[in-house]
Amino acid sequence: PVQPAGQQLLVEMMESTEDIPAKCLEESIDWNWETFPEYMDSISDGNYALDIGVQIPHAAVRFYVMGERGARNEPATPADSDEMARIVAESLREGALGFSFSRTKAHTYLDGWQPGTLSGIEELNPIAEAIAQEGGAPIMFSPRGVTGLYPSEREGEIELAAELSRTSCSPVMMCLIQHSQDPEEWKSVLDLFEAVSASGVKVFGQVTGRSIVTLGGFSTKFNPFMHGEDWPLLSHLSNSEIAHKIESDPTLRNRLIEGAESTRNLWQSRKFFEDMTYPLIPLGETSPQYEPFESIAAISERTQKNPLEVMLEVLCSHDGNGLLNYPHYNYADGNLDAVHEMLRHPNSRLGLSDAGAHLETLS
């Protein structure tokens, strides 16, 4: 649901959290709905190549009910919570498959977190009660520390999931990811899922079937050379023009490499260069090869070139359209063995795909 005055905020939220350019949304969305039932009527009029399933999302409902108070993450009043619960119940009757919310502070927009990030059990429980009254429906959320449940937070997030499952009489799924800071933590998280499930609640980890990656290139938000002094002189050019300038000017190429070396960022992690099992993979016109021997580190070792020089050559390839594939999660061991083990566990479910929402982050 969206109030007419709130349309721009939802666009900005989608741009910042889902990486969809605002211009694409503004030019492609027909704002011919306000309520969730009206939204369902709107999308049912289209012709699609795939069947569409819809969740009712907490952030939009909160902003619809509370306006700017909701956007600023002020606490919900009992009346606010009751109205949100009414809307969620109505949405389930109208065809929503489930309810979703986010507590991760990785999801930001404008100068703050998206609506609902700070919401706790007091706000969510009335919604869970409404879900139970409608016969139950899956609940999904991104927990605090979406990159992995950090020890200081994971038990509280899992207890929140258990309480919502208990109240809603429904399964609750939360993101479960292998992250490089602690590649084994997912095992203890699954143990906690098992422990709470023994009390009769249904809590599952939602696992993506692949690594979660960011793509870096000349026209993406991130690349290894963007923080150097010379990049602003190139960023307004087309990919082809950038590649031509770099390839025809050895001095510029060397300055870009030197600038990247002096402005360390995530692309220059020692792990990428020195650990051959954690590949930063070049992407070109052919299908990507995710084997460690195709990583930037491996190419650098074979050719005796600076890894940043190899990266720059990759980005200049294919007329400036070359890309680097940076695996954030589920690839800490250089393979998908952890994903395989997660998916074999009875307290996991396959999911967590962004389905094309992010333009530069793939899961």
Predicted region positions:
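Divalent metal-coordination and catalytic microenvironments
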Residues: 52, 95, 206, 304, ...
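Divalent-metal coordination cores built from histidine and acidic residues
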Residues: 1-98, 134
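Structural motif
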Residues: 50-54, 97-98, 137-139, 171-173, ...
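Functional cores that coordinate and move charged inorganic groups
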Residues: 73-74, 88-227
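Hard-cation-handling environments
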Residues: 196, 200, 204-330, 346
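C-terminal substrate/ligand-recognition segments
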Residues: 311, 331-363
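Glycine-rich tight-turn/loop motif centered on a GG-T
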Residues: 9-28, 32, 69-79, 110-120, ...
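Generic recognition of flexible, low-complexity loop/linker segments
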Residues: 87-88, 127, 161-162, 192-193, ...
